[in-house]
Amino acid sequence: MAAFQCPPERVLRPLARAISASQRRRQTYEKWPTGRKSYRAVMCNELGKPLVVEDKFSTENLGTSQVRVAVHSCGINFADILKCIGKYQEKPELPFVPGTEISGEVVEVGSKVTSLSKGDRVLGVCGQGGGMAEECVLPQTALWKIPSSLSFTQAAALAISYGTAYIGLKHKANLQPGQTVLVTAAAGALGLASVDLAANVFGAKVIGASRKEKLVIVQEIGATATIDYTRENIKDKVKELTDGHGANVIMEAVGGDVFKQCLKCIAWNGYIIPVGFASGEIPQIPANILLVKNCSAVGLYWGAHSKHDPQLLRESVDKTLEYFKNGKLKGPYISASFGLDKVNEAFQMILQRKSTGKVVINTKQ
């Protein structure tokens, strides 16, 4: 037998640590009051690499204002994908669980939670991620009760898209009935939400711009006119559709050349609201056009309101739920849903621009 090259206790030390850790986990399980030992979650362990599904241990004790939710669905936002490939402005520390929008059922509440009870159906916003899992813990202020008429899948597609559209159209642009709204990337989740609110709630005329094969759903949601921007010039088409006046409000999510074309067809005293850069090109805004047309370029990042104006953020979701309950909305539109184990396929569907509306991860599939 070969002699040990190092003391046996050093060889056995890692095994001892592993056994000790296993014992600690078992003790945690035994103390867990609801009997829930672990839950499955999507993990980003390395930027740009495939996501994996792993078991995570439940947080044993809730904070006084926290709520534990059994997640049924998690909506995918493009920001989730950008975070996982390292191209988002916010850089989560690795490893992390992606996912911002969730829906599910309350299973436990902290001692000072007054707005929610066990069994409530809710939607929620995970400001720090963590939604692509079977369970998450959120402050009560990040959750909303949902009506029975709203499915969990739909609820996971509501807050960010409709909240952004609401703040942009209502608070940034003060949209009025009869005005013209141009929506780029109109077949995406935010685009369809903007079309839905502008046409069906605020009474505006809506022009939706997207690829030809996706324009049917844009019209079904409420657009009165559409533009295939792979074949048609946005500026010329908008001028034609508005008798030369241009669009009063532009919800712009593409950037690059599309943004430049949009700025050239804005109405006098109009608003252009950049809400994303799907093209990957961040445009420069020529101030001379703003001056001559007396128009405004107003940025909108919905998530920042949680810090700077939480009351408006909450209003944006409250009002959206009210519109849904009153039957004013045609969406949210879901083009596909996947189980946790198919999350990489879901991301690819979005990256390859094969989706319309929202793509959702369902934990119960």
Swiss-Prot record:
Enzyme Commission number, as recorded: 1.-.-.-
Top-level taxon of the source organism: Eukaryota
UniProt lineage: Eukaryota, Metazoa, Cnidaria, Anthozoa, Hexacorallia
GO molecular function, one term: oxidoreductase activity
Keywords for the protein's UniProt record, in alphabetical order: Oxidoreductase
Enzyme class: oxidoreductase
Family classification: Belongs to the zinc-containing alcohol dehydrogenase family. Quinone oxidoreductase subfamily.
PANTHER family: QUINONE OXIDOREDUCTASE-LIKE PROTEIN 2, SHORT-CHAIN DEHYDROGENASE/REDUCTASE
InterPro entries attached to this UniProt entry: ADH-like_C, ADH-like_N, GroES-like_sf, NAD(P)-bd_dom_sf, PKS_ER, Zn-ADH-like_protein
Pfam families in the cross-refs: ADH_N (PF08240), ADH_zinc_N (PF00107)
Name this protein carries in UniProt: Quinone oxidoreductase-like protein 2 homolog
